[in-house]
């Protein structure tokens, strides 16, 4: 059974369900999740898209390096969080279970790499319709990801950020206004921005 370690998956489902599609018959839908872990976020996104748009060519990209990486998870001034590199518990057995769980999802494309490796390896992908940012929680990393994906978005694209109170979301949202993104709703843990133009 596909599980998750976060909260507000109901909000994630609602934001996918109400994703604006500005074409009667879109030629393709492309979604992404950075930081897959056990996979519930990706499952919610794919289930909502396939239920809403059956028959439309669809691909969901899942990015996660797994492997118990040692890295700094949070900004230095994040209250209650370590400001030094720590080892995550993203084990190879967790990855194998996730791959097995998604074997029934033909639209699921797993990229076993970091966000930076993915962005460098796939500069021509897009446009993305929905991105769930649940990977690194440092402001500089979230900004880098956001700008990369914003350059590969279109009108109606939605970005959802998990654990947004752990980094400078105000800076991220401000930078995304350049691309036409506006905040449409904020929960306690997740926030959704939509490209309006």
What label would you give each PLM region?
Residues 1:
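S-adenosyl-L-methionine
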Residues 9-197:
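S-adenosylmethionine/decaboxylated-SAM
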Residues 4-8:
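Phosphate/oxyanion-binding active-site loops and adjacent basic polyanion-contact surfaces
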């Amino acid at each position: 059974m596909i599980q998750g370690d976060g909260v507000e998956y109901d909000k994630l489902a609602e934001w996918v369900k109400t994703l604006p599609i500005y074409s009667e018959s879109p030629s393709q839908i492309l979604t992404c999740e950075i930081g897959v872990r056990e996979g519930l976020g990706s499952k919610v996104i794919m289930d909502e898209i396939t239920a809403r748009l059956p028959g439309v060519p669809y691909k969901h990209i899942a990015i996660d390096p797994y492997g118990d990486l040692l890295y700094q998870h949070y900004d230095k001034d994040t209250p209650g969080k370590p400001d030094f590199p720590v080892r995550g518990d993203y084990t190879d057995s967790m990855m194998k279970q996730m791959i097995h769980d998604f074997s029934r999802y033909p639209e699921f494309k797993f990229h076993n790499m970091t966000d930076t490796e993915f962005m460098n390896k796939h500069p021509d992908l897009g446009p993305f319709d929905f991105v769930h940012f649940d990977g690194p929680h440092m402001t500089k990393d979230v900004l880098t990801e956001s700008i990369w994906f914003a350059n590969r978005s279109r009108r109606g694209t939605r970005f959802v950020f998990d654990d947004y109170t752990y980094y400078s979301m105000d800076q991220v949202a401000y930078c995304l206004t350049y691309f036409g993104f506006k905040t449409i709703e904020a929960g306690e843990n997740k926030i959704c921005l939509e490209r309006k133009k």
